[in-house]
Amino acid sequence: RICPRILMECSSDSDCLAECICLENGFCG
């Protein structure tokens, strides 16, 4: 999957860019 390496806080996958998912630590990855 394509995920830009940008540190973004998230509460769900929809908060993240491209194909990033919301990880357990509260950030996209």
Swiss-Prot record:
<dbReference type="Pfam" id="PF00299">
    <property type="entry name" value="Squash"/>
</dbReference>
<keyword id="KW-0964">Secreted</keyword>
<keyword id="KW-0960">Knottin</keyword>
<feature type="disulfide bond">
    <location>
        <begin position="10"/>
        <end position="22"/>
    </location>
</feature>
<keyword id="KW-0646">Protease inhibitor</keyword>
<comment type="function">
    <text>Inhibits trypsin.</text>
</comment>
<dbReference type="GO" id="GO:0005576">
    <property type="term" value="C:extracellular region"/>
</dbReference>
<dbReference type="InterPro" id="IPR011052">
    <property type="entry name" value="Proteinase_amylase_inhib_sf"/>
</dbReference>
<keyword id="KW-0722">Serine protease inhibitor</keyword>
<dbReference type="GO" id="GO:0004867">
    <property type="term" value="F:serine-type endopeptidase inhibitor activity"/>
</dbReference>
<dbReference type="InterPro" id="IPR000737">
    <property type="entry name" value="Prot_inh_squash"/>
</dbReference>
<feature type="disulfide bond">
    <location>
        <begin position="3"/>
        <end position="20"/>
    </location>
</feature>
<protein>
    <recommendedName>
        <fullName>Trypsin inhibitor 3</fullName>
    </recommendedName>
</protein>
<feature type="disulfide bond">
    <location>
        <begin position="16"/>
        <end position="28"/>
    </location>
</feature>
<keyword id="KW-1015">Disulfide bond</keyword>
<feature type="site" description="Reactive bond">
    <location>
        <begin position="5"/>
        <end position="6"/>
    </location>
</feature>
<comment type="similarity">
    <text>Belongs to the protease inhibitor I7 (squash-type serine protease inhibitor) family.</text>
</comment>
